[in-house]
Amino acid sequence: QEKQAQIEKKPGRFFEDQPDVNDDFQIHFIYLLAKNTKDKERDLNGWIEKEVKKIDDTFFKMTGDKQRLKFDYREDGKLDISFARMDRKAKSGGWNVSYPDYYLQKQGFNNPKKLYFSFTDAASGDGGQMGPHHGYLFIGRASGQITKISIHELLHGNGFAMPCTKGVRDGAHLGVGILSQELSLKFGKAVYEHNDPTCPDLKDSVYLIPTSDDPFDPLQIACALGQKKRNNPPGNYEIPARYTHKKLLKGRKNEWCTYKLTEYASEMWFKDWKK
């Protein structure tokens, strides 16, 4: 492990979040490998920047050229991309509220004002997974649909579909648009500019720019609901008072947020993740 860490120290590679240009909410990218995954240097060779540019431009088009996602940039103006290698092997199934979330938070990727989106060459069986505030894009499985799957996952990272989103089904999905199986490049009226002030609208997320005059933080909503259903994470979280929709306040059976996992999880939970 030590030897591998030395080999992986390459010029231009950052193992931690670099100083922020401002104190705003932002999406931070990570090139994540499992214990024995081959390092394809996607954080160094421009691959991640290229994919993020496609995500950014497509998202902008989907909003009707109104808003973009807020990304984390370094002081030199470049996209801030970190590198992380887990000390365990990849495993199929859910990575959220599981060892990868736990490991990355232990490495310091635990700022409540960030969404962490990891591009990984390891595999889980899915194309992507995300919730507030960690997410994963599994490059091999997502191949050919990376932009679509990334936007789909980043919507989950922003809390969508919400329990009150019209037509929500199969957890946090919809029957049509980017949050459906078809992954078509439209949000659908239920998600963006839906005109129901009692239920969150994507246009008001703190992770969009220009930012709404009355924005919401998806972590607050997801963690408040997680506490209600699972009694965790620890801390105080509030759903903004203006969101009075009964379905939102009640939540679904399975509500969670990935925040503060290291504060209540024990290593024993992750014994299926082989060292």
Which functions belong to the PLM regions below?
Residues 127-133:
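Hydrophobic alpha-helical positions that pack around
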Residues 137-151:
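Short pre-active-site segment immediately N-terminal to the catalytic Zn-binding motif
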Residues 153-168:
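Catalytic Zn2+-binding segment of zinc metalloproteases
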